[in-house]
Design a protein with these regions (language model features):
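Formylglycine-dependent sulfatase
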Residues: 2-9, 20-257
Length: 257
């Protein structure tokens, strides 16, 4: 099971206040919700968790102004199934989406559907990876291709049922799409936007402007680079994602022959 740490900014909510023998009622305002997901993002790459490799000032601000969780877990470490768990609040064997080769049954109850019923305008933008089209969203623009992982450069999107290709880098494009939704949303309604970035998921393709940003930086080797799994169970040694088993010269190291 993958250990996930997340920083959440909790919006202020107005509550009913009760006095001595009298009750003063204040209008309860429905909070706007922005759910931000990055993909395979280790805490060592976030300075708000003490990571020193790079600085992440925007994430740090969210962590400082909200609540930072230091010990929480995803119920499924796979991309699509983990997303299905977030949407449904159910374990994978209950919601039926157990691996990335499956298709999510969007007919079941999800929290965006409940928010719609409560008067929210809902949107999902970025990586979806559930194969089926979104339900419970007034607007969606989700990555397609490469088995729904999407591409880093000039990616294709399914935008409200229409396939479109956007020129540029995927992180910039997803961010611009999210900002456009916020600018053009129905201001008379509260909103919930699920904002899902593809990065930094393998195969680690940066924006062209960042290709040389670490040319003069030497990163320390992690202690587990050549791990012998001493003192741990057999499952750790037999897991698939390791340098020896899955790291490739072309896909990962970008060494062209």
């Amino acid at each position: 099971m993958k250990n996930i740490s997340a920083a959440l900014l909790l919006p202020a909510v107005a509550f009913h206040l009760t006095g001595c023998g009298t009750q003063e009622k204040k209008e309860v305002k429905q909070p706007n919700i922005i759910f931000i997901m990055t993909d395979d993002h280790t805490t060592q790459a976030m300075s708000c968790y003490g990571g020193s490799l790079i600085q992440t000032p925007n994430m740090d601000r969210i962590a400082n102004e909200g609540i930072r969780f230091d010990n929480c877990y995803a119920v499924n470490a796979l991309s699509g199934p983990s997303r299905a768990c977030v949407l449904t609040g159910k374990f994978s064997h209950v919601n039926g989406f157990t691996d990335n080769a499956a298709t999510f049954n969007g007919d079941q109850q999800t929290f965006p559907k409940l928010l719609q019923q409560a008067g929210y305008q809902t949107a999902v933008i970025g990586k979806w990876h559930l194969i089926s089209e979104p339900q419970g969203f007034d607007h969606w623009s989700i990555l397609t291709g490469q088995e729904e992982q999407g591409d880093y450069y000039s990616p294709e999107f399914n935008e409200n049922g229409k396939r479109i290709t956007e020129e540029g880098y995927v992180t910039d494009i997803i961010t611009d799409k999210a900002i456009r939704f916020l600018d053009n949303r129905d201001k008379s309604k509260p909103f919930c936007m699920m904002f899902h970035q593809k990065a930094p998921h393998r195969n680690w393709m940066p924006a062209p402007r960042h290709l040389g940003i670490f040319n003069n930086t030497v990163f320390p080797e992690p202690a587990t680079l050549f791990d012998d799994y001493k003192g741990r169970g057999r499952a750790a040694a037999e897991q698939d994602m390791s340098l020896a088993k899955t790291f490739t010269e072309d896909w990962d190291l970008k060494l062209m022959t």
